[in-house]
Amino acid sequence: MQRLRESPPPKTRCLGEASDIIPAADRFLRCANLILPWLNPRELAVVAQTCKTLSLISKSLTIHRSLDAARSLENISIPFHNSIDSQRYAYFIYTPFQIPASSPPPPRQWWGAAANECGSESRPCFDSVSESGRFGVSLVDESGCECERCEEGYCKCLAFAGMEEIANECGSGCGCGSDCSNRVTQKGVSVSLKIVRDEKKGWCLYADQLIKQGQFICEYAGELLTTDEARRRQNIYDKLRSTQSFASALLVVREHLPSGQACLRINIDATRIGNVARFINHSCDGGNLSTVLLRSSGALLPRLCFFAAKDIIAEEELSFSYGDVSVAGENRDDKLNCSCGSSCCLGTLPCENT
């Protein structure tokens, strides 16, 4: 009769052995890599002080964030450069286009290591960076332009050279599709840019390549506000500016009738949610950018788009004129100092009561 082989007694395992520690550490790292990219800089700094591992992850995140302000939402990475102080990047929620205003607090956005696909395990989606997204509102009439092809005589949309003050583009319904040559501004940033820290002006947007006259730079993206909400926020921003170092990015744009009378007011706030245009500074000489109020066929509202007003060389700061309206009153304390450095600098930034 064959004798059954006796099984060896089970080995006693002690807590803390490598087989227990490694899976636990792996789970810890995976959780950290999923959670930390949602944190803002202040929260990240607090977490970094808790242990060496989280400190290393936080430092890695800081490096990744400084490499691309656009969080892979544009065609090209837009890095931060700072040789002035220890601030590696400016924190805000990125959107490539206009979105309806969000209620406070602002939504969070993943900002971690670059990923090619939204929805992957390493990069959760942020659904407010779509023209409908979580707001359930579309700013575009999907019917768009019905032209057969974008050529003179076939398309009613105006093809332009980036020098007009008001112009039109084909919309999403164009028969040419997304490759239409008259939908330049709808394809996002396509020139190399970088964000540089200046001792006087703070963050500035610079060209990182030669940009030819008439080339599209970017649109001014942010939250679309009602006039009442714009006034409410501006009051808050003014109070913050009086007590601390604070810079807002609330821009008021007016579309005028041929008679010169304003017919449409658009309030775009890029302070909390915006794109790289929030870093474009004022220049009293008009700067090197031209602004175009551009309507895409079928769109409900125009967009403020920036084009090169002349050839712009690499390492040149991008700037435009904020306007000619000055704050009412003689109190200079109510005005913001201008540091544009142009020969015709007026010393204060153009602004108006919203």
From Swiss-Prot:
Alphabetical list of SUPFAM superfamilies matching this protein: SET domain
Gene for this chain: SUVR3
Pfam families recorded: SET
PANTHER family assigned to the protein according to its UniProt record, in alphabetical order: HISTONE-LYSINE N-METHYLTRANSFERASE SET-23 (PTHR46223:SF3), HISTONE-LYSINE N-METHYLTRANSFERASE SUV39H (PTHR46223)
Organism (species): Arabidopsis thaliana (Mouse-ear cress)
Residues annotated to bind Zn(2+) 3: C150, C170, C176, C180
Entries under InterPro entries matching the protein: AWS_dom, H3K9_Histone-Lys_N-MTase, Post-SET_dom, SET_dom, SET_dom_sf
EC number from the UniProt entry: 2.1.1.-
Enzyme class (EC, first level): transferase
Domain named Pre-SET: residues: 143-188
Amino acids binding Zn(2+) 4: C284, C338, C340, C345
List of residues binding S-adenosyl-L-methionine: K201, G202, W203, N281, H282, Y322
Main subcellular location: nucleus
Claim: Transferase is one of the keywords in the record: yes
Location of the protein in the cell: Nucleus; Chromosome
UniProt KW Transcription regulation keyword: no
Ranges for domain SET: 191-323
Domain Post-SET: from-to ranges: 334-350
Descriptive protein name: Histone-lysine N-methyltransferase SUVR3
Any GO molecular function: histone methyltransferase activity
Family of this protein: Belongs to the class V-like SAM-binding methyltransferase superfamily.
Residues annotated as transmembrane: none
Binding site for Zn(2+) 1: C145, C147, C150, C155
Positions with a binding annotation for Zn(2+) 2: C145, C157, C170, C174
